[in-house]
Amino acid sequence: MKLKDGLILREVAGQFVVVPMGKRVQEVTSIVYISSSGAYLWDYMKDHEFQKEDLVKKILEHYTGVTGEQAAVDIEKFLKTLADNNILDDGKIRGQVFVKMPKGTGKDGV
């Protein structure tokens, strides 16, 4: 998975805010704040495709006193927040997709 393009992270009044640009303004309709650890991950995520395990590893390398189990739970919540706010491109097609098939190629031969 990866972050969608057209999104930047800005620090405003001590808080990290995801700012949509261009066409993303219509998709990301809420103000999304992320923690400093989320901002640390964002810096990696903006330039890489990643899996949950990659982010857990980054957290464990950067922070002391965090267990792998707790990091995995926190990363899952973080990724859900990003996905719920149309920030994460996880490769899944959402919504309806209609494909017009040429005659004779349908499952019933029509």
Role assignments for model-derived ranges:
Residues 5, 18-19, 67:
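Intrinsically disordered, low-complexity segments enriched in polar/charged residues with Gly/Pro
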Residues 10-40:
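Short alpha-helical segments that sit at the start of domains
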